[in-house]
Amino acid sequence: MIMTNTEAVAGHKIIKNLGLVKGNTIRAKHIGKDIMASLRSIVGGEIEEYTQMLDEARNEALKRMEADAKEKGANAIICVRFSTSAVMQNASEVMAYGTAVIVE
């Protein structure tokens, strides 16, 4: 599956637009990791526990978006974007979305 954040796929012609596709996940760290992250936020620096959590969430959201596109018969996704939001304390949602297309 070709995925790009641009409106076209270099070297390919879009022959059909299949519409919006998306994938999302909500992730939270367990209490031990959350305590460590809180302590690290006091002294400054990267909060590696959350960096890892969001990286895993983005990858899962991409997989789910790709599955949605395959279900619609697409072989590419253009205009890929991410959205992140806090849905509750210590939990974040990551959504990947884009436009499913067929390219040749």
Swiss-Prot record:
Covalent S-S links between cysteines: none
Top-level taxonomic group: Bacteria
SUPFAM superfamilies: YbjQ-like
Family: Belongs to the UPF0145 family.
Name of the protein: UPF0145 protein DehaBAV1_1363
Organism: Dehalococcoides mccartyi (strain ATCC BAA-2100 / JCM 16839 / KCTC 5957 / BAV1)
